[in-house]
Design a protein with these regions (language model features):
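Short, structured beta-strand/loop micro-motifs enriched in basic residues and often containing a Trp
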Residues: 310-317
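Conserved small/polar residues in nucleotide/adenosyl-binding loops
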Residues: 330-337
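Acidic, contiguous internal or C-terminal segments within carbohydrate-active enzymes
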Residues: 45-59, 68, 155-202
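Short edge-strand/loop segments of extracellular domains
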Residues: 73, 202-209
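Beta-strand-rich interaction surfaces with strong enrichment in secreted/lumenal proteins
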Residues: 169-172, 320-324
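Beta-strand-rich N-terminal accessory domains
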Residues: 1-92, 261-284, 332
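Active-site/ligand-binding surface loops and adjacent short beta/alpha elements
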Residues: 110-113, 206, 210-282
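An extended acidic
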Residues: 1-23, 85-156
Length: 337
């Protein structure tokens, strides 16, 4: 039986009611064609449950947006979608090409502010998000009574005489599902040990994000990034209206787990009777950053599972928690969004 729209239907009966499966679920290849987004290749994926999301082949297989039954879930920053050729490694230019989106991948050489390590300049939140996917593939087919949709690709963060790190990503969903899964593997294809930093910038926006939206985050330790003091729970859990001329808050969490070692965090809008949750193994991402931006025009909330806090690779905190790859050492079954 196929589970669809809260009910069940025989596969044969479903096929009797449609001409092609793309009538209810599929992956449409698209190419953006205006402004700084011109040339971005992407797939628009929809699975019949009302869940839709856009995966950008030209930008790390990151997600430009996600919607559920027509309701936007994600944040789109002021620059909008920006093609990789506008990427600028220098200084404070990050805000000129940061699209936000449902997922913006940060790393692999740096997360946090820009810095210089020996002869290498590292930009704010790293290069990987601006890296086009290679060896890409889309697969949409029946497996018994399940219609499965997936997209995959490889992103190479590499330089002559320097690192060769490869992020292998697969994003998958199925007909009728209210979720998708991101499975990432990072490989060191070079011949020397490399530091690795990884953060998933998962960005929520209006109308899911609105006054009185709740953040559900089981945490053992929470600190305010500005002064490293223990934060009032209400401060990071409660969403307000946008405030003109205000500033954002950033909180550092050590999330709690269930008996299986998984962490689950969520954002819930009771007025819309709608929420989104992330579930992942804490051993893969021991830290969580919450970016709460109640600023008018930049109104967003990001939940950011990460390998260490985003204080750039040269900070003492990052050095203390740095992970290294000698070969294929780091794998992750990432969040269900």
């Amino acid at each position: 039986m196929v589970k669809l729209l809260g009910g069940e239907i025989e596969k044969a009966d479903l096929l009797r009611k449609i001409g092609r499966i793309e009538q209810v679920a599929g992956a449409r290849p698209v190419k953006l064609a205006s402004g700084k987004a011109e040339g971005i290749k992407a797939w628009e994926i929809y699975n019949g449950s009302g869940l839709e999301f856009c995966v950008m082949e030209s930008k790390c297989l990151d997600l430009l947006y996600a919607k559920y039954r027509g309701v936007n879930l994600s944040f789109l920053a002021k620059p909008g979608a920006v093609a990789p050729e506008y990427f600028n490694v220098h200084g404070m230019e990050f805000g000129r090409y940061f699209h936000g989106g449902m997922l913006y991948t940060c790393g692999l050489g740096n997360i946090g502010q820009s810095c210089v390590d020996e002869d290498t300049e590292y930009n704010w939140h790293g290069r990987i998000s601006q890296t086009p996917a290679e060896n890409t593939g889309i697969n949409a087919e029946w497996n018994g009574d399940e219609y499965l949709i997936s997209v995959k690709g490889d992103m190479h963060e590499a330089a002559h005489s320097h690192e060769h790190l490869v992020l292998k990503r697969k994003i998958s969903t199925r007909l009728g599902a209210k979720s998708f899964t991101i499975c990432d593997t990072v490989e060191n294809q070079g011949f020397k040990r490399e530091a690795i930093m990884l953060l998933y910038h998962i960005n929520f926006g209006y109308p899911l994000l609105d006054r009185n939206t709740r953040v559900v985050l089981p945490t053992s330790i929470t600190e305010n990034y500005v002064n490293y003091t223990k934060s009032d729970e209400q401060a990071f859990r409660h969403i307000t209206d946008p405030v003109d001329g205000s500033s954002c808050d950033t909180y550092f969490h050590r999330p709690a787990t269930d008996a299986s070692g998984y962490t689950s965090v969520a954002i819930i809008n009771d007025d819309l009777r709608l929420g989104v949750y992330l579930r992942y193994l804490r051993k893969d991402f021991p830290f969580m950053v919450e970016w709460k931006n109640m600023v008018s025009g930049d109104y967003a909330l990001a939940l950011e599972p990460c390998t260490q806090y985003p204080l750039n690779r040269m900070s003492k905190e990052a050095q203390k928690n740095m992970q290294f790859l000698d070969c294929l050492l780091y794998t992750s079954d990432a969040a269900d969004d």
